[in-house]
Every structure is written in C-alpha cells, then in structure tokens.
C-alpha cells in the first residue's frame, strides 16, 4: 500500500507502531490521497461530460465557504466519491443542458433564504471537526460575508454562471442543515444496507436449517459486515505521545 510505503521509506515510521503520532500521520496521509484521487476523478469526468467550467465554479464556491461554514462529511470513501460525482459533475451537467431558469423574483427569494440559513446554522461543526465556542462568532461573520460576496457576484455575471454560483451556495447550505446530516454522512444508507444484508442472511440460514430444528437468529453482537465492506476510515483518538 502506498501509504504504508511512505510511512516506512519517507517518514521513517514503523507501520505496525500504534502510537498516536504514527496513527495520526497515517490518517492524514489517507485523507490527503483520498482527496487527491477524488479531485482527479472529478476532473476527468468533468472533461468527459463537458462540465469543466461549471465544475470549477462549484469547486471554488465550496472551497471558499466550507472552511468557515463547516458542514457534514460522508463517513465512507465510496459514498464521498459518489456524492462528489453527483455534486460536481452530474447536477452541473443538468444545469448546463437545461433551458429552465428561475424568474428573477425567485432568485432574490432564494438569496434571502440562503442568508438566513447561513446566519442560523453556520458554522456547522462535526464530531471530527468541532467548532470551538471562541471561534463561533468569527466564523459566523465570515460565513455571512462570503455568502453575501458570492450573491453579489451572481448579480453581475451571465445567467448560466449565476445559476451555478447559486447552486454551489445551495449545496453548501444543505451541508450545514441538521435534517440532512444522516443523508450526507450516509447513516441512512448504512442502516438500510445492514437491514438488507441481515434479512438476506437470515433467509439463507432459515433455508439451510429448515426441518432441522429451531430457526437460528443472527447474533446481535456480530461484526458490522456492511461497515467493513464500505471501508470506513475512522479518525484516531488524540493520544499523541510527546
């Protein structure tokens, strides 16, 4: 594995070492290369689907807002990649090839709604990246300033570009809403997937044990098959040794 090779040959760290420093280094390398892979994947797909400019605008909007507004993250690499494809390529492709446009009055209402949304929910911290109370007001002000700047920009550019900017604002707004947390993180899909796998296994076990005796039940403490298959990467606890 590339990360293990880097730890051993470049960072001069033992990959079997369970100390905090090694685990944190491995975690951040995993995040870095996962992000790099996603970026290359999005770039290639945007070129293939002819959405390079739209994808770039959405990317700039989210990069501009996310550091101060925060927001939910997908819990698995595969879900993150799927959401990235939808957000950066699929929907921009639809916007580019659609002739439908919002009337100006609806755009103004949407802009006002976005300002209220960011005022109310930004910054949105997570368990991995919590917002410190001392930073709350500063980040909220920065979020509102950046949202207002993007809204002003959308008023002085071509309609197609303005639509993409507003779309990026809407996406970032959805990422900080409490009601979208389970959807974006993938908890809904994980729960649904585990239920399907459990039902399938129970049916197969029931067929095998049919006529033999009492129908066996799955152990409630059995490993999380679905979570392991998805390959979720957990952030190590803060136990770095000085």
Swiss-Prot record:
User: What processes in GO biological process is this protein linked to?
Assistant: proteolysis; quorum sensing
Pfam families on file? AgrB
- Key words, A-Z: Cell membrane, Hydrolase, Membrane, Protease, Quorum sensing, Transmembrane, Transmembrane helix, Virulence
Q: Name one GO cellular component term.
A: plasma membrane
Q: What is a single molecular function from GO for this protein?
A: peptidase activity
- List all membrane-crossing ranges: 29-49, 52-72, 78-95, 100-120, 160-180
Give the membrane topology, semicolon-separated if more than one: Multi-pass membrane protein
Protease in keyword set: yes
Tell me the domain of life: Bacteria
Where does it localize?
Cell membrane
Q: What is the purpose of this protein?
A: May be involved in the proteolytic processing of a quorum sensing system signal molecule precursor required for the regulation of the virulence genes for gelatinase (gelE) and a serine protease (sprE).
Under HAMAP family, the record lists:
AgrB (MF_00784)
Query: What family does this belong to?
Result: Belongs to the AgrB family.
State the name under which the record lists this protein: Protein FsrB
Q: Tell me the name of the encoding gene.
A: fsrB
């Amino acid at each position: 594995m590339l990360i293990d090779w880097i730890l051993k040959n470049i960072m001069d760290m033992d990959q079997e070492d369970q100390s905090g420093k090694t685990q944190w280094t491995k975690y951040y390398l995993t995040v870095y290369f996962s992000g790099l892979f996603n970026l290359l994947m999005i770039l290639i797909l945007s070129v293939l689907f002819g959405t390079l400019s739209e994808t770039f605008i959405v990317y700039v909007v989210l990069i501009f807002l996310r550091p101060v507004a925060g927001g939910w993250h997908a819990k698995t690499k595969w879900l993150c990649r799927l959401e990235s494809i939808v957000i950066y390529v699929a929907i921009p492709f639809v916007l580019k090839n659609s002739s439908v446009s919002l009337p100006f009055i609806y755009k103004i209402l949407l802009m006002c709604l976005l300002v209220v949304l960011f005022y109310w929910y930004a910054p949105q911290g997570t368990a991995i990246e919590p917002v410190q109370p001392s930073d709350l007001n500063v980040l909220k002000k920065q979020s509102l300033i950046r949202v207002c700047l993007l809204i002003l920009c959308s008023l002085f550019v071509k309609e197609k570009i303005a639509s993409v900017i507003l779309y990026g604002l809407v996406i970032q707004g959805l990422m900080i809403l409490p009601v979208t947390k389970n959807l974006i993180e993938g908890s809904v899909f994980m729960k649904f997937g585990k239920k399907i796998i459990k039902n399938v296994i129970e049916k197969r076990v029931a067929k095998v044990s049919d006529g033999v005796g009492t129908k066996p039940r799955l152990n409630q403490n059995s490993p999380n098959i679905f979570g392991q298959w998805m390959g979720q990467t957990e952030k190590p606890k803060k136990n770095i040794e000085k």
